[in-house]
Amino acid sequence: MSLCLVIACMVTSWIFLHRWGQRNKSGPKTWPLVGAAIEQLTNFDRMHDWLVEYLYNSRTVVVPMPFTTYTYIADPINVEYVLKTNFSNYPKGETYHSYMEVLLGDGIFNSDGELWRKQRKTASFEFASKNLRDFSTVVFKEYSLKLFTILSQASFKEQQVDMQELLMRMTLDSICKVGFGVEIGTLAPELPENHFAKAFDTANIIVTLRFIDPLWKMKKFLNIGSEALLGKSIKVVNDFTYSVIRRRKAELLEAQISPTNNNNNNNNKVKHDILSRFIEISDDPDSKETEKSLRDIVLNFVIAGRDTTATTLTWAIYMIMMNENVAEKLYSELQELEKESAEATNTSLHQYDTEDFNSFNEKVTEFAGLLNYDSLGKLHYLHAVITETLRLYPAVPQDPKGVLEDDMLPNGTKVKAGGMVTYVPYSMGRMEYNWGSDAALFKPERWLKDGVFQNASPFKFTAFQAGPRICLGKDSAYLQMKMAMAILCRFYKFHLVPNHPVKYRMMTILSMAHGLKVTVSRRS
């Protein structure tokens, strides 16, 4: 009994001294053995804002965990060092790869070294293609108009819609057509159930939880809890992905066998989609290894082309609803585009009746005809609205890197090999030391000088990463977002459904936890 009492006193004293030694510590307080895991788990649903609170006064926060240490950074000097200056010391790393492998495999977002370089080189070549850009422009307009039609029906029927759900459908259909050459029709008028999207989102949430769940490997081994659900979700994801790959391979084979029977549309798809390019350069397209690598490529492009774009558009529409002055300025810019086009072609603007379904839709089709790569490039305020959205609500709110060798960041913070360094775009966009005293305000004008958009350093505005891993699809993403926003914001006002909760969901992408329920009204 006395021995137990002595041990209890020793443990209590140890814990007390451990906590007492942290009384002046600026970062999260830790406990013996578990580090800051308790505080992180307690704040899991608001982790991005939890980091903002620490990084506001300290540009670097060190968070010890049971098996590693996370170092979070928000100072552009440190970010540039990690993403560019000493890039080779900060790969994705084995830890990150082990967490994400079940979902992203060895795709471009989850690989390092020669495998990453090979995929990036191929993707870079495709994204630089004018043919892909022109094909993408047509596809993005097509699906933006499909979304418009659904919203038009909702406006006449005075129905609520979930904009996040609709935008996720639009971007999934778009990436499947542009990236993989197939049409899947999730944005059809009847809005068919989308099992893949639900399973993909579930898997994304669970792999994100792995970063702070020290028991995930045990749960995976026992096939219980969240890891059991992950396994079921991945099966749905894989079934869909392999069906896309096999369908595309069959179409390519058919095109080779009967090239004269293909119409122009099929020829375009054969030439311009990204998946076809990866199939063509593979040594043995029908081997299991190749199918697995193609699966990884497809899912990495899905998360890049569907999730990030739809999430940004969702937050952009929300911010426009919350800032009516921004909505009106954007509307004026879109009207000005119409007027300039009419003057350039010496034609009069078509009049339409917002209460007449056909008249309204005809006007929209006419306006969409004005939108192309060049005309969208003139919409500087729209570009600023999207960029300002990304500053405050970056699609990828934090991005961890592994540490290969012991190192010291420019501000003097020491990092150990085997740890992780995470730059935090969500926090960086809210820091006054990065953006000034009005950092918390949604202010598209901060990006304009004499009405012309001005870029910021990619190490300060990190929504598209920076350095050797800078996002290859940045221009394509802006193209799709501007196409959709131009059509929607020219003809609609959005109204948040009363009492609808707006908060983010903890996953690798900053999506809304409850969607974005709105009603829409037609503009004259």
Swiss-Prot record:
Swiss-Prot/TrEMBL cofactor(s): heme
Disruption phenotype: Lack of exine in pollen grain walls.
Gene3D superfamilies: Cytochrome P450 (1.10.630.10)
One record GO biological process: sporopollenin biosynthetic process
One Pfam family cited in the UniProt record for this chain: p450
Superkingdom, natural source: Eukaryota
Keywords: Heme, Iron, Membrane, Metal-binding, Monooxygenase, NADP, Oxidoreductase, Transmembrane, Transmembrane helix
Keyword Oxidoreductase set for record: yes
Transmembrane segments: 2-22
Positions that bind heme: 471
Entry's localization field: Membrane
Family membership noted in the UniProt record: Belongs to the cytochrome P450 family.
PANTHER family from the UniProt entry: CYTOCHROME P450 (PTHR24296)
The protein, known as: Cytochrome P450 704B1
Taxonomic classification: Eukaryota, Viridiplantae, Streptophyta, Embryophyta, Tracheophyta
Gene for this chain: CYP704B1
